[in-house]
């Protein structure tokens, strides 16, 4: 039997449904915007911030001096050595050929095509310091920022940027001339030799309580690809055995997810950005604070100079650049090795050795190839002396990230290049840990290290 719903009851139900729908719609309109539309707006804000920081950070990394012209130009007057006496400076000046020979790099993308063609034809004299001034005016010398006179014949001011030590070029145009490779360690750069050319090294001598001749000896002891970022804190110019005390320039790529930076892990990436900008580049705008460095026993020079507590003249401006710089740095991926640069079959076998027999992954945890957290080990744990570790507040050595290792083999391995080859590193750990790896396993392991 079919039961029919009376028309009046059906109409009543429709009215109730309509009223409920209207009430729900009204509630939705009056509710806080936390739904999909708000999410889209928030996502857009994140995307906009990401793009802004990335682009700004690239500019900061490549071109920002943080006001360090006051040191390089006004104080030690390095620009005068670059100019040479024919352009108001001192000495013979620095030609492009000389600049390239000490590891400075030239960004080919900053040079107009017409001039590129002239260089390729040999129509530009690369032994003329005037050409260096022209390259500086074009912002073509990687990591050096200069303002020239109206006629381009002299340098009004000059400073350095992060890219000086932590960028190189791909040599696509000529050795030392090519497209920028941000984040790559410039292991050709002879920082000490370049600084030693400055006409006024007396401020450094006064800081270290020594003479200019000794300062030059120290600067020239480092050699290509090395720099001593602790000399102005502890004054230890040489190792106890008389060897130079500089460390290899580290890369600035593959840092996403990496907590501690540099060889002895004194701080995070933002820590080191402020440390370097304020105390090594000598940026006047940057504030840096670390009371650990005020200990007169460990850091007598810093305790005297106050470099553990610098207050920039425009810290707000600098801080607004340091966040973008950090964002850009952690956005730079570790470069993949070129195809054919390693034995793929051996690398596949070496990965198994890395993860198992050699115990490498215990500390170099994939995919970061360092340890998440506080990745510091004692000198005894890695089987070396404590000299460099004891210059750091950590008194230890950081587990260095291994991705992109193939890009910075020049100068050797470990913080001071004490191991000339990866084979030497593998042999060191084989003996230290009693691994008893076979010759084949060692070869395969090296190929894997070159593949990551």
Map each language-model feature to its residues.
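Periplasmic c-type cytochrome electron-transfer domains
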Residues: 2-16, 21-452
């Amino acid at each position: 039997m079919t039961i029919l719903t009376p028309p009046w009851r059906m109409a009543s139900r429709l009215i109730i449904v309509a009223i409920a729908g209207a009430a729900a719609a009204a509630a939705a309109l009056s509710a806080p915007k936390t739904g999909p539309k708000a999410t889209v707006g928030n996502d857009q804000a994140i995307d906009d911030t990401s793009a802004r920081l990335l682009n700004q950070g690239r500019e900061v990394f490549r071109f920002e001096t943080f006001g360090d012209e006051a040191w390089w130009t006004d104080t030690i007057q390095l620009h005068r050595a670059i100019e040479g006496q024919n352009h108001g400076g001192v000495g013979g000046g620095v030609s492009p050929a000389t600049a390239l020979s000490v590891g400075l790099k030239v960004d080919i993308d900053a040079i107009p095509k017409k001039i590129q063609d002239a260089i390729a034809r040999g129509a530009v004299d690369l032994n003329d310091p005037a050409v260096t001034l022209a390259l500086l005016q074009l912002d073509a010398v990687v990591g050096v920022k200069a303002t020239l006179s109206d006629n381009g014949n002299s340098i009004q001011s000059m400073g350095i940027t992060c890219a000086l030590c932590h960028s190189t070029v791909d040599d696509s145009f000529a050795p030392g001339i090519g497209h920028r490779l941000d984040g790559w360690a410039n292991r050709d750069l002879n920082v000490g030799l370049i600084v030693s050319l400055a006409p006024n090294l007396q401020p450094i001598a006064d800081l270290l309580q020594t003479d200019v001749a000794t300062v030059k000896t120290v600067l020239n002891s480092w050699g290509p690809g090395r720099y001593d970022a602790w000399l102005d804190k502890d004054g230890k110019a040489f190792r106890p055995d008389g060897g130079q005390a500089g460390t290899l320039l580290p890369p600035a790529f593959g840092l996403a997810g990496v907590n501690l930076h540099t060889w002895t892990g004194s701080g995070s990436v933002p820590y080191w950005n402020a440390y370097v900008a304020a105390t090594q580049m000598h940026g006047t705008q940057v504030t840096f604070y670390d009371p650990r460095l005020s200990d007169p026993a460990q850091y007598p020079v810093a305790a005297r100079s106050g470099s553990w507590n610098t207050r920039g003249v425009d810290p707000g401006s600098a801080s607004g650049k340091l966040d973008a710089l950090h964002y850009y740095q952690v956005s730079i991926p570790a470069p993949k090795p070129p195809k054919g640069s390693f034995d793929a079959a051996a690398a596949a076998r070496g990965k198994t050795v890395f993860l198992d027999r050699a115990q490498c992954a215990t500390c170099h945890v994939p995919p970061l190839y360092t340890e998440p957290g506080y990745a510091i080990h004692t000198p005894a744990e890695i089987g070396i002396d404590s000299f460099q570790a004891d210059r750091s507040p950590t008194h230890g050595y950081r587990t260095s990230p291994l991705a992109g290792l193939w890009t910075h083999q020049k100068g050797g391995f470990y913080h001071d290049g004490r191991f000339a080859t990866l084979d030497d590193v593998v042999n060191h750990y084989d003996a230290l840990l009693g691994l008893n790896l076979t010759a084949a396993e060692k070869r395969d392991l090296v190929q894997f290290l070159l593949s990551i």
